[in-house]
Amino acid sequence: MQDKNLVNVNLTKEMKASFIDYAMSVIVARALPDVRDGLKPVHRRILYGMNELGVTPDKPHKKSARITGDVMGKYHPHGDSSIYEAMVRMAQWWSYRYMLVDGHGNFGSMDGDSAAAQRYTEARMSKIALEMLRDINKNTVDFVDNYDANEREPLVLPARFPNLLVNGATGIAVGMATNIPPHNLGETIDAVKLVMDNPEVTTKDLMEVLPGPDFPTGALVMGKSGIHKAYETGKGSIVLRSRTEIETTKTGRERIVVTEFPYMVNKTKVHEHIVRLVQEKRIEGITAVRDESNREGVRFVIEVKRDASANVILNNLFKMTQMQTNFGFNMLAIQNGIPKILSLRQILDAYIEHQKEVVVRRTRFDKEKAEARAHILEGLLIALDHIDEVIRIIRASETDAEAQAELMSKFKLSERQSQAILDMRLRRLTGLERDKIQSEYDDLLALIADLADILAKPERVSQIIKDELDEVKRKFSDKRRTELMIGQVLSLEDEDLIEESDVLITLSNRGYIKRLDQDEFTAQKRGGRGVQGTGVKDDDFVRELVSTSTHDHLLFFTNKGRVYRLKGYEIPEYGRTAKGLPVVNLLKLDEDESIQTVINVESDRSDDAYLFFTTRHGIVKRTSVKEFANIRQNGLKALNLKDEDELINVLLAEGDMDIIIGTKFGYAVRFNQSAVRGMSRIATGVKGVNLREGDTVVGASLITDQDEVLIITEKGYGKRTVATEYPTKGRGGKGMQTAKITEKNGLLAGLMTVQGDEDLMIITDTGVMIRTNLANISQTGRATMGVKVMRLDQDAQIVTFTTVAVAEKEEVGTENETEGEA
């Protein structure tokens, strides 16, 4: 038999209904602040309860347990711990920009220490908290019954300053959360006044007076673009960074000193995190971490090793610890009983409307009170003007009611006026008292007229709001604590975590690449080429050697006309004897694609620097280095190649320089680079040399009159010729003879300019390699055949050669070379 007290319900429907009720209760009545006073219900009840207890700044502190118990018993039946924790936060300087509670005792620390139990601590309202409740007894806000209908509590506080922005808010509701940063009081008040003076004001205009958040712990806000977006939309993110300085000790060592941490960061946890990073060797160069903070302020010291870079360590700390954090704006608040994400302008507008209502209701209350008092005084003045008749009526009456009725009938008085006459003391019958009553009455009439004028003129209401805000600003405003750094700051890149140093990049003929310390080789100018390679196989040699920096960019040009970009630190570091890493592991090269040239692009490269391209079919192109500033990971097309053409060489040309191009049939053309106009990256180029049928380009170099032109033929002949024998002519000619081509010496294998004191590395198509000094190669005329440089096996041909600078063995290690026949 079913119990009549049981009701069958659908579980799904009940869960939906109950959860919605619960969610709305949490959202509206617990977790989110009201846009008008910036308070959640618990904070509002704490302040109102303290005000009712009389725990004001001019009174002694009262036990926190007494305050908590009173608030819980009358207004907030949710447990004393939640009430006490909320009150503690309002008393912490690192949590609230302007504390609303003045705590006495242990109220915790920014290291995460908990406050003492509520039975040990004491509290009272702070001075600025009084401004939140000012005029609350003048019917400025609505009151409702408390949870048991035995008390009345305010729905919102008058809030004579914009507390939602000034102290911010954080809270997690059901399915939504709020995160509003604190701001400087003076700046926020200026923003309120700006909106009142100019309703058409933009977010950009507002940021002139309210540039951004002002956190109680100070620190730095990196960039303003995130602030503007958050103010415009209610959502956004900013980067907060610790305020640091690098000190140098008497012994010459460096130390990092942190004086301000980002908002809500626990510096004890930061300390523990740094120690853990050092132990795990994720950060190197730190010898000690100390927290020297005291009552004077925060001082967090990080000692740095003598040979370590404090700036690099600091950048690592910013990236790996909470010394740099993101603050996410989510300006969600209750407006008209509904949770909404609000822009800065909407928050200011809501506050202004609230203040207008407060001022109007207060003015109306004062006017009604003044009118009631004037009404009484008017009756007293009538009585004083007819005092003898009044006394006669009173004496003749047997009861108070009879006297009151007679007075009302005789002098046309109201019940309240007649009662006031009956209550009047005899001493007020004197002439002096009559003058006082008349003066008070006249003042009240003037006040009533003024209050009526305020109610009739909205502009006067606005002016009162601004005047009262100015008074709050005068009393409580202070200097900004958080510094706003101009310009947007991106997240820390890898190079910020790597110390800049000079290095050497080597690329072998077989495509092995590595990075070495500069000390591994003899010193060269950055961008230079040509020390011998080490650590390569017997059939390999270093074809490209570039002196650069770990922070500089390297451009890799391939035979297919594509370009790739790496920074110096992105190339793995190897020892001098290691062969390195195949370059295909770093660059996404096609199977038949190979690196032709490596160019160092220094960070301080001049604006007139150009890259000069030469293809096998004689096409040339000149393009500004700046065109290659942004290159994707999978490379970029450096020039358009046609008809199975391929890129031979890329030269870095600055200023007024000549170019020489050599062809397979033994011809060369020299012209000034200015003969080729600057072109875009995707351009095809123009004709640099007019090739004969079957001829191709085999080499191109920059040339000056102090250089020598080196040519090597496929059958092992070579020569050096002074550059002055190659006059500068126009672009696109067939060229002048640079070698006497015969069946004996073969076609040209290559052409390049040299200084004359380098070593020459030559390699054949069978893998045989020889190294010889250029002094062993005769200097002859332009149209000669040259001398035998390398004796080849039958059917073998020279395929490539390059120069390397001469270096002593003790500086570079053992040479790797395979001699050909003499």
Swiss-Prot record:
It comes from the Bacteria. The active site is at Y120. Transmembrane segments: none annotated. Disulfide bonds: none annotated. Its EC number is 5.6.2.2. Few gyrases are as efficient as E.coli at forming negative supercoils. Not all organisms have 2 type II topoisomerases; in organisms with a single type II topoisomerase this enzyme also has to decatenate newly replicated chromosomes. Heterotetramer, composed of two GyrA and two GyrB chains. In the heterotetramer, GyrA contains the active site tyrosine that forms a transient covalent intermediate with DNA, while GyrB binds cofactors and catalyzes ATP hydrolysis. This is DNA gyrase subunit A. It comes from Streptococcus pneumoniae serotype 4 (strain ATCC BAA-334 / TIGR4).
